[in-house]
Amino acid sequence: IFLRTEKHPTVDQLKQQIDYTSLDSFYEKEENFEEVYGQIAQFIVQKGKEEDLVFAVPGHPRVAEKTVGIIEGLCKENNIELDIIPSMSFVDAMYNYLGVDPAEGFKLLDAFELEESYIDTSTNTIITQIYDPFIASNVKLKLMEHYDDEQEVCIVVGAGIKELESKTYVKLYELDRHQELFSYLTSLYVPRSEKKLYNTVHDL
């Protein structure tokens, strides 16, 4: 059993019941996440050629888990049998916790890809990987190009983990002032806005 990361509260329960290998060391070897995802995928596929294994990730394996997509592609190339088992995603947990219907529409974005992403203010948005104040500050500045500074956003921590989950509503300009809220369990929910700032060709 291999875990992409053991930086998740539920892993404490696993420690008491099963033996596993954490792949957090890959994050220390590479400079960017794309390299990390690729290296982890290569490692898992190579191990899969030698023996049956389980590769576990937090939440749903097809939601914001790039390693799974890379592994799937490599398995097809190498004729390795792969079984992807679904689970509740953090997106499901967030919407349930916030009391919002995802059928109203939403967009899922990665904080590290925000510069290249199209920000659609007319739909609800969830932004992942906001795990420290520096990233939060960059996200704030990017969003302020598209939203009003007074736009209300919600910092969500540990959605779906009852003993840890919290939600804090703040104005967009205040986002990076709440340093204690940012960790590997933090995501940002940005409700759709009626106001539009015309800053890009897409907005015209």
Question: Where are each of the predicted segments found?
Answer:
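A contiguous loop/helix-start segment that scaffolds small-molecule binding in enzyme catalytic cores
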Residues: 49-53, 120-204
